[in-house]
Curated annotation (Swiss-Prot):
Cellular component GO terms, alphabetical: cytosol; external side of plasma membrane; extracellular region; Golgi apparatus; HFE-transferrin receptor complex; MHC class I peptide loading complex; MHC class I protein complex
Phylogenetic classification of the source organism: Eukaryota, Metazoa, Chordata, Craniata, Vertebrata
Signal peptide: 1-20
Gene that encodes the chain: B2M
Protein name (database record): Beta-2-microglobulin
Physiological role: Component of the class I major histocompatibility complex (MHC). Involved in the presentation of peptide antigens to the immune system.
Family: Belongs to the beta-2-microglobulin family.
Location of the protein in the cell: Secreted
Disulphides: C45-C100
Pfam families: C1-set
GO molecular function (one): protein homodimerization activity
Principal location class: secreted
Domain Ig-like C1-type per the UniProt entry, residue ranges: 25-114
Organism: Cricetulus griseus
């Protein structure tokens, strides 16, 4: 009985400790294929290494939220940090600017990462 109580106590303690972990997200913005003006492609925003799991990810075109953005299932690493992929179909042009905006409790303000076309 005492052993069972100790095991339950350790499990609860580990859950509480996990909730105390705070890690800011790492953000990468890239396309599925090399970009060509006027040719359909996919814009991806890969957000990783964050905790807790509550997060908001938006893809932006010229500063405005894009429609039809899909999210992968929330997944986690061995260290309990989380990762998520937001993506949408888009047709790049030379004049349009694309970015990913991430809102998370570890950030004082949303993190905006611009898509660097030449990367």
């Amino acid at each position: 009985m005492a052993r069972s109580v100790a095991v339950v106590f350790l499990m609860l303690l580990s859950v509480v400790c996990l909730d105390a972990i705070q890690r800011p997200p790492q953000v990468q913005v890239y396309t599925r294929h090399p970009p060509e003006d006027g040719k359909t492609n996919f814009l991806n925003c890969y957000v990783s290494q964050f905790h807790p799991p509550q997060i908001e990810i938006e893809l932006l075109k010229n500063g405005k939220k894009m429609d039809k953005v899909e999210l992968s299932d929330l997944s986690f690493n061995k260290d309990w940090s989380f990762y998520l992929l937001a993506h949408t179909e888009f047709t790049p042009t030379a004049t349009d600017k694309y970015a990913c905006r991430v809102t998370h409790t570890t950030l004082k303000e949303p993190k905006v990462v611009t898509w660097e076309r030449d990367m």
